[in-house]
Swiss-Prot record:
Gene: ctaB
Membrane topology: Multi-pass membrane protein
Listed GO MF terms: oxidoreductase activity, acting on NAD(P)H, heme protein as acceptor; protoheme IX farnesyltransferase activity
Entry GO CC: plasma membrane
Name of this protein: Protoheme IX farnesyltransferase
Residue spans crossing the bilayer: 10-30, 67-87, 99-119, 139-159, 167-187, 220-240, 252-272, 277-297, 338-357, 362-384, 411-431, 432-452, 460-480, 488-508, 530-550, 555-575, 584-604
Miscellaneous information on this protein: Carbon 2 of the heme B porphyrin ring is defined according to the Fischer nomenclature.
Reported function: Converts heme B (protoheme IX) to heme O by substitution of the vinyl group on carbon 2 of heme B porphyrin ring with a hydroxyethyl farnesyl side group.
Record region (COX15/CtaA): 1-338
Protein source organism: Thermus thermophilus (strain ATCC 27634 / DSM 579 / HB8)
Family statement: In the N-terminal section; belongs to the COX15/CtaA family. In the C-terminal section; belongs to the UbiA prenyltransferase family. Protoheme IX farnesyltransferase subfamily.
EC number: 2.5.1.141
Principal subcellular localization: membrane
Keyword Cell membrane: yes
Span list, region Protoheme IX prenyltransferase: 339-608
């Protein structure tokens, strides 16, 4: 039972958390203004004095930071002692307060080492960069410990870490990713201080110049890391809210999405304005807020008694799996036949970008990493849609429906594939290619599967954009950038997708109607569907000719595209005239051949 004393302690704990956030932000102000050496190489005294007399501005800034940090230390110590007195043995708030005190001690020691070893002001050593990252990581841990203490003191329940399956893994990876992002941000901010630039273009040029200082070269990576981590954090947030449904987890997931969007915008403004001090502070404040929000999401999802969709009313595991799963069952989770065309466009995107052979290493990275990322998305889709898959003839034998693979194991398999796929693409190609593959995965799972598929007939048009990411991945893997031609490949698949999938929807519309999925034929009927297919086929044909106007492709592609488009339009017209299964099947099968041959024609044309 919550007592008045506990309520007062909870209020104090929240206040201590807020104070430590402010102290950490002021520490960033000390670094950004170059005031870290304001007290010389003395610690805990300031220039050999307990209280400096007639201090310079830098000295006053540094001394103020030390004084406020000292108050923060005392506030955490008081929180620990109060928690010991107020809560019984075994209460999680006591553990949280003890953890906070530990990280406060290490925070002080790391801060002292920066001063005593001279890793302040204009020092550009690798040691300073490493300690700066450790300092940031320790601050994150301190704030997390204080947040947990406040949560538990406010009545939050203890955590259950065992048996959480993919949810636990997703949250752990999210915390790890945010920690890595914060550390990269700390190094980037240090580079902005020590190696200022006159413009964004100059920053990019210097970042790509061989022989530049490592702090300069690391600057270009932080934005890509930020986008990658942001995509994952938003994805993990909504997935956790789906698997651990509650009003709080849903609000936290939505808050993460909005807050991270604001953070990316702040990052762009920070770069455009050449990292002014006030913008650096705001950027860091948003980073702390995102970190704490994710900590609270993890806490609410892992709390004992939290609702788990993989558990029945009595707490028994459902979709546990019948056992005996083979490698074929796990391969089936990835939907190899569906992936084949995605992988084809990714690999030929690389061939088109390279105007020939891109190299074995890049080709294998795109093939293996691309398959893993797409396979991960498909495995998650099977878990989410297992309820409707069981009632559709086409999908009734999927391993998540027959329960040869449990939902828990399928999700763990999916996350393992996603992590490995991202790593393969980053290591074998570059971070941009890995980020684009992650964007495709998240678009398919969040936008299409979790949001659009069961809500609107526009699901294919908007959600189908996920299938347009593979050629971007292949292109970026070769060039490290996205040109206008790369976006043309994206647009081509985007407009081709409704032609392909609405033809499929016509073939199995009875299944979709039975399970309540609002595909276009179910909502508006066959006539509206075939009209839409014809319109998108015409748009696809027109877009396929655009590279010729830009001078990117020649006569070989012109001949191939004219023939392929003529057949696409003829089959679409045949479906319009006779909207029956036979003509729908014909268009569906040809649309796959159309896209494959069109990409092959581009690759050959650019190579000769």
């Amino acid at each position: 039972m919550k007592t008045p004393a506990w309520s007062r302690l909870a209020g104090y704990a929240w206040g201590v958390l807020l104070w430590n956030v402010l102290v950490a932000l002021f520490g960033a102000y000390v670094r950004a203004t170059g005031s870290g050496a304001g007290c010389g190489a003395h610690w805990p005294t300031c220039n050999g004095e307990v209280i400096p007399r007639a201090p310079q501005v830098e000295t006053l800034i540094e001394f103020t930071h030390r004084a406020t940090s000292g108050l923060a230390f005392l506030s955490v110590l008081a929180l620990f002692l109060w928690a010991l007195r107020a809560f019984p043995k075994g209460h999680p708030a006591r553990f949280g307060a003890g953890l906070a005190l530990f990280f406060m001690v290490t925070e002080s020691l790391v801060g002292a080492s920066l001063v005593l070893f001279g890793w302040t002001a204009d020092n550009v050593s690798r040691e300073r960069a490493v300690v700066q990252m450790v300092h940031l990581a320790n601050t994150y841990f301190l704030l997390a410990a204080l947040a947990l203490t406040a949560w538990w003191a406010s009545g939050g329940g203890p955590l259950r870490l065992r048996g959480q399956g993919a949810v636990g893994l997703a949250l752990f990876l999210g915390l790890l990713a945010l920690l890595f992002l914060g550390m990269s941000g700390a190094v980037t901010a240090l580079g902005d201080l020590l190696f200022p630039v006159g413009s964004t273009l100059e920053a990019l040029e210097r970042s790509l110049t061989p022989g530049e200082h490592f702090l300069v070269r690391l600057r270009v990576l932080h934005p890509l890391i930020a986008v990658s981590v942001g995509l994952y954090v938003v994805f993990a947030g909504y997935l956790v809210a789906h698997l651990r449904p509650s009003p709080l987890t849903r609000r936290l997931a939505q808050g993460l999405a909005y807050l991270y969007g604001a953070q990316l915008l702040a990052g762009l403004i920070n770069v455009a304005l050449k990292a002014p001090v006030w913008m650096q502070i705001l950027h860091l404040l948003l980073a702390y807020a995102i970190w704490l929000l994710f900590v609270f999401l993890a806490t609410s999802a892992l709390e004992r008694g939290a609702k788990r969709v993989e558990l029945g009313e009595g707490g028994e595991a459902v979709h546990r799996g019948t056992g005996g799963a083979t490698w074929r069952d796990y391969l089936a989770l990835t939907k190899p036949r569906v992936i084949s065309l995605l992988l084809f466009t990714a690999l030929f995107g690389a061939l088109i970008a390279a105007k020939g052979w891109p190299g074995l290493g890049v080709f294998l990275a795109v093939a293996l990493g691309g398959y893993m990322m797409a396979g991960a998305a498909n495995a998650i889709n099977m878990v989410v849609d297992r309820d409707i898959d069981a009632r559709m003839k086409r999908t009734a034998k999927r391993p998540t429906v027959t329960q040869r693979v449990s939902s828990r194991d399928a999700l763990l398999f999916a996350f393992a594939l996603a992590v490995l796929g991202f790593a393969v693409l980053w290591w074998g190609a570059n971070l941009l290619a890995a980020t684009l593959a992650l964007m495709g995965l998240i678009w398919y799972v969040l936008v299409y599967t979790l949001y659009l598929k069961r809500r609107t007939w526009h699901n294919i048009v908007i959600g189908g954009a996920a299938g347009a990411f593979p050629p971007l991945v292949g292109w970026a893997a070769v060039t490290g950038e996205l040109s206008l031609f790369a976006w043309y490949l994206f647009a081509l698949i985007f407009f081709w997708t409704p032609v392909h999938f609405w033809a499929l929807a016509l073939m199995i519309q009875d299944d979709y109607r039975a399970v309540g999925v609002p595909m276009l034929p179910v909502v508006l009927g066959e006539r509206a569907t075939v009209i839409q297919i014809a319109l998108y086929a015409l748009l696809t044909a027109l877009i396929s000719l655009m590279p010729l106007l830009l001078g990117e492709l020649g006569l070989l592609y012109l001949a191939a595209s004219l023939l392929l488009n003529a057949l696409l339009l003829l089959k679409s017209l045949a479906l319009y005239r006779r909207p029956e299964r036979r003509t729908a099947v014909s268009l569906y099968k040809y649309s796959m051949l159309y896209l494959a041959l069109l990409f092959a024609a581009m690759a050959v044309d650019r190579a000769v």
